[in-house]
Regions:
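Multi-pass alpha-helical transmembrane bundles in non-GPCR membrane proteins
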Residues: 4, 11-236
Length: 236
């Protein structure tokens, strides 16, 4: 229960900080930017490997599209996060990049679901397409909230992030039965990494804690990359 309370506290803190951006030191922002720039480099390398794997395995158009959506979401998220943290607080681009940073989180989440739903679960009743459409609909709505009225809807935005992230729980049994065990375990590991990062994020007054949070986001991404790799490797 303490972990659950800490996670709830994190969500409340995130909503508050979305409205009044925390002022990080120059050194903190440097590390915040550097940490997610690692995600850009890793994402580019993995993108090439995944696309090559889909083509080599003779994957259909849906498989390729799902991987492209995943790569788009992940790279957009890390790119805008890096640019936002690297941008001077005095720059007129700072607020615009913040909106894009928040929007790209939706794309990252929806993109991450795409290979799982369009390859591993596409033929599992209506679950694959249902989750895919739900997540991308949430991403569209969430992007609108972030771009046009971020301050007014920061709590709603946080709820959208959480709902999207937990969508797979609704079809956990179907997902477990549809994929190899190691895929399931890597996705579980991803969830643990993100929740752990959220717990650390709740200590937002601690110096460099945002960089620590970024580390767990990267760890979650690595877990998901491995899950998708095994989906491509075993299910195409």
């Amino acid at each position: 229960m303490p972990l659950c309370k800490r996670y709830v506290a994190c969500l409340k803190n995130y909503a508050i900080m979305s409205d009044d951006v925390k002022k990080y030191t120059v050194e903190e922002e440097r590390w915040n930017a550097v940490s997610h720039s690692v995600g850009i480099v890793g994402g580019l390398v993995v993108s090439a490997l995944f696309i090559k794997e889909v083509i080599a395995k003779g994957g259909d158009g849906w498989a390729l599209a799902s991987v492209l959506l995943y790569m788009f979401g992940m790279l957009s998220s890390y790119t805008f996060s890096t640019l936002y943290h690297a941008c001077s607080p005095a720059s007129r681009w700072r607020k615009k990049l913040r909106k894009l940073d928040h929007s790209a989180i939706y794309w990252h989440i929806a993109g991450s679901y795409s290979p799982i739903t369009l390859i591993a679960m596409r033929d599992v009743g209506y679950w694959g397409w249902g989750i895919f459409l739900f997540c991308w609909l949430c991403a569209i709505v969430g992007t609108s909230l972030s771009l046009y009225s971020l301050k007014k809807h920061n709590i709603l935005e946080t709820v959208c992030y959480v709902l999207m992230g937990l969508t797979i729980v609704v079809a956990m049994k179907q997902f477990y039965n549809a994929v190899p065990l190691r895929v399931f375990l890597w996705v579980v590991g991803e969830g643990v990494a993100y929740i752990t990062g959220a717990v650390f994020y709740s200590f937002h007054k601690v110096k460099y804690i945002h960089t620590v949070f970024h580390f767990f986001v990267l760890l979650g991404s690595v877990c998901h990359m491995l899950a998708v790799w095994y989906v491509l490797n075993t299910m195409l």
